[in-house]
Design a protein with these regions (language model features):
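The conserved beta1-alpha1 loop
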Residues: 50-54, 122, 245
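Conserved acidic catalytic loop of the alpha/beta-hydrolase fold
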Residues: 99-117
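Conserved HGGG/HGGXW glycine-rich cap/lid loop of the alpha/beta-hydrolase fold
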Residues: 38-88, 280
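Conserved serine/cysteine hydrolase catalytic core
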Residues: 24, 204-262
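Helix-rich cap/lid subdomain of alpha/beta-hydrolase
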Residues: 152-210
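Catalytic active-site module of serine/aspartate enzymes centered on a nucleophile-bearing elbow/loop
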Residues: 266-299
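A short loop-to-beta-strand scaffold at the N-terminal edge of the catalytic core in hydrolase folds
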Residues: 30-40
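Conserved hydrolase catalytic core segment
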Residues: 115-154
Length: 299
């Protein structure tokens, strides 16, 4: 397997981001593939926030939320999916599958022996992340869910179809420009931090593939796992949940999220940010504070 590793100098002096890099390269079945993660706060803390980014982002997306969570006394772990951020990037698009990503994250959680997890998800962080407790139910205790879905082979509508076609027609999509359009309040340097992991098109196999993997047609890999996940959240979930919605998201906005809320047992009324879009973490500080307040954590 041909693998690329983004040079460290691409990540120097990123605005608002001074977190130390951590790596693991010996996950079972992923030996030699280096996975990057942030690990903030006390490792012996009672609560662990596991924050999962999505397409086409990386740990940088959570920079506004990490201090809020860690200041509450919790541990905060933010991994990058393979193909994204500071994690290694297989060159062949075909390497990237639903199970490739999901099994890596299950192994990562086992490797760090994360417990009492507050799962924090958005976009693919949720499409994949919301299936994880099915196989590790005793590790998860709370959920913070933003602009995502649990697709089970049904269309997500014209907005997603347009997004999928958009990415397919741009094999070297400028992730920084995308983020600037989606989050106009970002500075140019902040937006460029999302292009930092990708020196050229060869590094973007994961970016190209994620939209193709969303389970919007019958028979796609991941559908059966997603169906199990829906049943888990609806019938078996015993933990606390917090939902926030960016109302300007044209794909995974209010309609999709209100449907998802019905799937999550005892999920309370969501917080809706009318000014926010798909990448809700870029409005993340007040969201993190509201979640802690709802959970009763000290802040």
């Amino acid at each position: 397997m041909e693998v690329l590793r983004t040079p460290d100098d691409r990540f120097v002096d990123l605005p608002g981001y001074d977190f130390a890099a951590n790596y693991v390269d010996d996950l079972p079945d992923y030996e030699g593939l280096r996975v990057h993660y942030l690990d903030q706060g006390a490792k012996g803390a009672n609560q662990t926030f596991l924050c999962l980014p999505g397409e086409p982002t990386w740990a940088y997306l959570y920079r506004r939320m990490i201090p809020v969570f860690s200041n509450s006394g919790a541990r905060v772990v933010v991994p990058d999916w393979l193909g994204f951020g500071r994690s290694d990037k297989p060159v062949d698009d075909a390497v990237y599958t639903f199970d490739f990503h999901r099994n890596m994250m299950l192994a990562f959680i086992e490797h760090l022996d994360l417990r009492n997890i507050t799962l924090v998800v958005q976009d693919w962080g949720g499409i994949l992340g919301l299936t994880l407790p099915v196989d590790q139910p005793n590790r998860f205790s709370r959920l913070i869910v933003m602009n995502t879905a649990i697709p089970v082979g049904v269309s997500l509508g014209d907005g997603f179809r347009a997004w999928k076609e958009y990415v397919a027609s741009r094999p070297n999509m400028d992730c920084g420009a995308l983020m600037k359009r989606a989050c106009p309040h970002l500075s140019d340097l902040e937006a460029q931090a999302y292009e930092a992991p990708f020196p050229d098109q060869r590094y973007k196999a994961g970016v190209r593939r994620f939209p193709q993997l969303v389970m919007v047609e019958p028979g796609m890999e991941g559908i059966e796992t997603a169906k199990r996940a829906r049943k888990f959240w609806q019938d078996e979930w015993e933990g606390e949940s917090f939902m926030a919605i960016g109302a300007k998201d044209p794909v995974l906005g209010l309609t999709v999220m209100n449907q998802l809320r019905k799937t999550i047992r005892r999920c309370p009324e969501p917080i809706v940010l009318e000014e926010a879009g798909h990448f809700l973490q870029e409005w993340g500080e007040p969201i993190a504070q509201a979640a802690l307040k709802q959970f009763g954590d000290l802040y």
